[in-house]
Amino acid sequence: MDFIDEVKLYLKAGDGGDGCVSFRREKFVEFGGPNGGNGGKGGNIVFVSDANLNTLLNFRYRRHVKAGSGKSGASRDRSGTAGKNIVLKVPVGTQIIDEESEKIILDFNKPDMEFLIAQGGKGGLGNTNFKSSINRAPRHFTCGQFGEEKYVVLKLKVLSDVGIIGMPNAGKSKFLTRCSNADTKVGDYPFTTIKPHLGVAKVDNSEVVIVDIPGIITDAHLGIGLGHKFLKHVERCKILLHLIDVTHDNVVSAYNCMRNELELYNSDLVKKEEIIVLNKCDLLRKVEIFEKKNHLANYLNKEVLCLSIGEDLQPILRLLNEKLKKGSSKKVDVYDPFKR
């Protein structure tokens, strides 16, 4: 399934229906009064966050969204039918951004949030509303109001437990494929992954949501390569799983390159908890692996794990799950736009 994480939309709420000018035309009623009905209200456009969605694929061929307009009023004091509302479902983690001001209108950070983005126009008044003691046969009415219209940008920042980061060809996709139900492309060449992939790994009686971020290279924060477009997804991950190809000539340099790009993009990213893994350890001799592992561990003063291509992933997944449980016990302040 294609992963779409940014779309531009034109939104147009429905216009209100016009009021009606009408008079009673009944037998034996010589001076029938006004009976023109009001116009119907225009339809609204509403966004709703849906936990079952993980991409903006629904908007690939739907860039113009228009709600139904209200019908005009009719005789015998009949009001026009209201326009049909449009409900747009988006994944949790979607931001609605005003295209002109580039300001965030709303951040859908939890499921089942609703937001009225475009208000339908009010219906016009029929001539019945203008009847008075001095004007018993008014021919005045009002037109329906126009519905709101605006251009917005939807940006999806994937909400996941673990983000797999690393240089191109570090084995990220292979890891995700082996530990989850994700259908990712795996190849022995850089940039096999050109879009994020989500997977769910089962760990004992728990589930861990993992996202594979496309390979990030030097100057990714400036838009070089593929990384800049997808670095935003790292922001929503609780823990980073940093995979480093053990066959790299300098594992310290590979580590620093990745960390520098994260910090230059957003300094808060390097504050996230990180598990470091030297991957593809079956491709080197044990002596070489031991040397590189100690070199990196001593440089960082952190624990460094090793992983072979065919090795059991459960120990690493259990470690991730334990850290997630510890992190969930901490109170985290989440912005709630509906809280007063």
From Swiss-Prot:
Binding residue positions for Mg(2+): S173, T193
Keyword Iron carried by entry: no
UniProt superkingdom: Bacteria
Binding site for GTP: 166-173, 191-195, 212-215, 279-282, 310-312
GO MF terms held by the record: GTP binding; GTPase activity; magnesium ion binding
Keywords tagged on the record: Cytoplasm, GTP-binding, Hydrolase, Magnesium, Metal-binding, Nucleotide-binding
UniProt-listed Gene3D superfamilies: GTP1/OBG domain, P-loop containing nucleotide triphosphate hydrolases
InterPro entries named among the record's database cross-references: G_OBG (IPR031167), GTP-bd (IPR006073), GTP-bd_Obg/CgtA (IPR014100), GTP1_OBG_dom (IPR006169), GTP1_OBG_dom_sf (IPR036726), OBG_GTPase (IPR045086), P-loop_NTPase (IPR027417)
Subcellular location: Cytoplasm
Enzyme category, top tier: hydrolase
Coiled-coil segments on the chain, per record: none
Function: An essential GTPase which binds GTP, GDP and possibly (p)ppGpp with moderate affinity, with high nucleotide exchange rates and a fairly low GTP hydrolysis rate. Plays a role in control of the cell cycle, stress response, ribosome biogenesis and in those bacteria that undergo differentiation, in morphogenesis control.
Quaternary structure, from the entry: Monomer.
PANTHER family: DEVELOPMENTALLY REGULATED GTP-BINDING PROTEIN-RELATED, MITOCHONDRIAL RIBOSOME-ASSOCIATED GTPASE 2
Family: Belongs to the TRAFAC class OBG-HflX-like GTPase superfamily. OBG GTPase family.
Protein name as annotated: GTPase Obg
Gene name as annotated: obg
